[in-house]
Structures are given as structure tokens and as C-alpha cells.
Amino acid sequence: MAIYRLPREVSFPDPDLAEPDGLLAVGGDLSPERLLTAYAAGIFPWYGEDTPILWWSPDPRLVLEPERLHVSASLARTIRRGRYRVTADRAFEDVVRRCAGRARPGQDGTWIVPEMIDAYVRLHRLGFAHSFEAWEGEALAGGLYGVSLGGAFFGESMFADRPDASKVAFVRSVEWLARWDVRLIDCQVRTEHLARFGAREIPRAEFLARLGRALDRPTLRGRWDLDAGDRPAGA
């Protein structure tokens, strides 16, 4: 099957036209309009330093429903000890850059290339992209970032500089997203790490149907502040 080359105008082909590995289209740009259109259609960018922009919609899709979150006994003990303090949107760009600097098994370079960093920083300034940070004292120890649309959160990447820091940030992020009535967390493709937290694969058709329902909910746009109570500041 031929790979669809994106036109200048913002549009995407039907995700059902994706290759078996999930590759759907090539080209385009990382403008806020195109990125938000992609996420709303269940499509995300993922490419390397020496390739054009590639767009994906894998089948099956890895998702986490907050009510299915599994926390191991050892991680629960770490959380109870209070080693890390978790915040939201305090260090978005730092989190993205730390994620970009992490080597991944089987990858020669990073997929979070400079233009990707710039694109998500723009989304953050527009109130659609968010980070959760784990701090040890005043040091950023770990974190994650993603995109929020309607009642869905699209996780992008995480990092840890200290033991369990990203895991603590992840657990707290899921707990807060559930409190804000986010019911669908997109984890994109299966990893054993996320599966241990309770993430599971579902058919793409089911994911898109659930995403459509999630998008009927209002987007929690703006800077998130975990000290703001039951709703993030700006929402």
C-alpha cells in the first residue's frame, strides 16, 4: 500500500489506510493546527533525525483507563515515603528536553528532534500540552509530557534521572487526570513498562470510537496547577 503524502492544507487520510505497522502518512509540518487535527483523529507524529515527518495510527492501540491503574507494592511504598513532590506545568520545556536526551533501547538517536521540541512548546503555550514533574528537593528528578484534548490525554514520553521518579510522576498524573474526569489515556504502542501499570491494547476502531466520545468533553486548556484543587488552573 502506498504511503499518503500530506498536502499543504491540513488534512489526513482515514486511519484505516495505515500500513500494518501503523504508518499512515509522510510530510506536512508540526504546526499547532496540524498536530491538534492529528491527535483528534487518533494520529501522532514519530520520526527520527534523518527522516521526513512520519504520521502513525497503529492497530492495536495501547491505552490506559485510569480506573485500571496498577501500582506495585514497592512503588506504593516509594510514593508513601514522599521522596518526590509532583507538580504540573512547572518545567514543561525542561521535561521535553530531558526526554529527548534519553537513549532508548534499539534506537540510535532520539525521535524528539529539535523541531518536535519547538512544536510541543508551542502547544504548551497554547494550553494544550502539559507536563508532570517529580522533584527531589529543588532538583527535577523525572517527569512526563503529553497533549490534552477533550476527555483524552495523549502521553508522549517520560524520563527519570533518579530511581522511580518517572513512575511516581506517572501514577500521580493518572490519579489527577481521573480526578479531572479524563477517562482515556493514549499510550500509543505497547511497552512492558506501561503494561505493568495496567495499560492494554484495544483495536484501533474501538480506540477511535472511544476517542470520539472523549472529544465531546471540554478540553482542560491552560496551565495546570495541582495546588488548584479539583480542577486545574486555567480549565
UniProtKB/Swiss-Prot annotation:
GO terms, biological process: protein catabolic process
Pfam family, one: Leu_Phe_trans
The reaction(s) this protein catalyses: N-terminal L-lysyl-[protein] + L-leucyl-tRNA(Leu) = N-terminal L-leucyl-L-lysyl-[protein] + tRNA(Leu) + H(+); N-terminal L-arginyl-[protein] + L-leucyl-tRNA(Leu) = N-terminal L-leucyl-L-arginyl-[protein] + tRNA(Leu) + H(+); L-phenylalanyl-tRNA(Phe) + an N-terminal L-alpha-aminoacyl-[protein] = an N-terminal L-phenylalanyl-L-alpha-aminoacyl-[protein] + tRNA(Phe)
Enzyme Commission number, as recorded: 2.3.2.6
Enzyme class: transferase
Superkingdom, natural source: Bacteria
InterPro entries linked: Acyl_CoA_acyltransferase (IPR016181), Leu/Phe-tRNA_Trfase (IPR004616), Leu/Phe-tRNA_Trfase_C (IPR042203), Leu/Phe-tRNA_Trfase_N (IPR042221)
Keyword check for Plastid: no
GO cellular component terms, A-Z: cytoplasm
Keyword Cytoplasm found: yes
GO MF annotations in UniProt: leucyl-tRNA--protein transferase activity
Localization (cell): Cytoplasm
Keywords: Acyltransferase, Cytoplasm, Transferase
Main subcellular location: cytoplasm
Recorded family membership: Belongs to the L/F-transferase family.
Function: Functions in the N-end rule pathway of protein degradation where it conjugates Leu, Phe and, less efficiently, Met from aminoacyl-tRNAs to the N-termini of proteins containing an N-terminal arginine or lysine.
Protein name from the UniProt record: Leucyl/phenylalanyl-tRNA--protein transferase
Species classification: Bacteria, Pseudomonadati, Myxococcota, Myxococcia, Myxococcales
